[in-house]
C-alpha cells in the first residue's frame, strides 16, 4: 500500500533528514485516566467496618447557641471535637491507610437520651464545617496517627445534645476519556440526555457518638476555656484551630486581683478612670459642663474669699466690719458674680 505524501510540509523539514510520511508520524496516545491514584489498592479495598476503630479523642463540653441570620458572630463548639482512626495491623501492617485520600467523616446532631437524630436539615441546626478529611499528624507520643478534626462547628438550637460522627470511604471507578466520548455520542444518537457514568460509590465504615454537651444562651455561656494540649499540638502542625491562652474566667479574676492589690484609694480610683470607656468619660464631662455650680467650683477655690480685692477696699468693707453689721463674708457661689469678677476690670481693681 502506497502512502500519500503531503508535499506542502516538506519545506519545514531539514533537507539532510529523511522525510517521514504524515500518517506514520501520528503516534497514538493512550486515553488519560481521570481518577485519583490510590497508594495501595489492596489496602483501600480491604477496609471494612470490622477492621476500623473510630474513637473520640477530645470531647465537646459547651457551645453558645448561634442565632439565625447572625452566623458570622457565632462561636465554635468548645473544645473542638477530634477523632482518631485505627486499623487492625493484620489488615494493614504497613499502615497505608494513613495516606488514603478517600476517607472522610461527617457529623450530625443527635438527642442526648435517645439514639435519634434531631429533626431538620443539617443546615437548619448546624453551622460551619460539617465534614473532615483525614489528617496525618503526630500524636502527643510522637507517633503518626489518622485524625479527623472539627474546629468550626456551631449549633443553632438550644438544649442538650450529642454528636454522631460517621466514617465513610469513597470507592472511585476508573473511566477513560474514550468512555466519556462514547457516552456523549450515544446521547447525540438517541437525542436525549442519559444518566452520567458512575464515578464511584462509597461505603460506611462505622460511627461513634460523643458525650452529651449543653448549648446555652449568651447569658449562661461561661466563655471559651483554655486550649488543650492536643489542640496546641495539632495547631503547631498546620491544622487551623482557634487557640486561647487563658480561660475567660481566669482573665477576669486576674483583673480584679491586680486592681485591688496594695493600691491606695486614690490610685485605685485613677486606675478605674483610666479603664473607663472613652464614650462614658465624654458623657460625664458634658453633664458637668452643663451644671454651672460644677463648672465654677474650681474657680471659687482660687478667688474666694473676696475680702482682699481692691473693690472691697474702696468701699471700706472689711471682713470684721461685715461681721459687725451682721453680714457674711462675701463668698458668692453664683455663676453671675463669678463671671463678673473674672471678666469685669472694676471687680478686679484694674
Swiss-Prot record:
A motif (Nuclear localization signal) lies at residues 274-281. The lineage of its organism: Eukaryota, Fungi, Dikarya, Ascomycota, Pezizomycotina. This is Spore development regulator vosA. The N-terminal velvet domain contains a NF-kappa-B-like fold and is involved in DNA-binding. Gene3D superfamilies: Velvet domain (2.60.40.3960). Induction: Expression is negatively regulated by VEL1. Forms a heterodimeric complex with VEL2; the formation of the VEL2-VOS1 complex is light-dependent. Residues 46-244 form the Velvet domain. It comes from the Eukaryota. Component of the VEL2-VOS1 heterodimeric complex that plays a dual role in activating genes associated with spore maturation and repressing certain development-associated genes. The complex binds DNA through the DNA-binding domain of VOS1 that recognizes an 11-nucleotide consensus sequence 5'-CTGGCCGCGGC-3' consisting of two motifs in the promoters of key developmental regulatory genes. Required for normal pseudothecium development and regulates asexual spore compartmentalization, pigmentation and germination. Residues 267-276 have a biased composition (Low complexity). Belongs to the velvet family. VosA subfamily. Pfam families: Velvet (PF11754). Residues 250-296 are annotated as: Disordered. The keyword Transferase does not apply. GO terms for biological process: sporulation resulting in formation of a cellular spore. One of its GO terms (cellular component) is nucleus. It is found in: Nucleus. Its main location: nucleus. Coiled coil: none annotated. Disruption phenotype: Produces only albino pseudothecia. Reduces tolerance to oxidative and thermal stresses. Residues 253-266 have a biased composition (Polar residues). Keywords: Nucleus, Sporulation, Transcription, Transcription regulation.
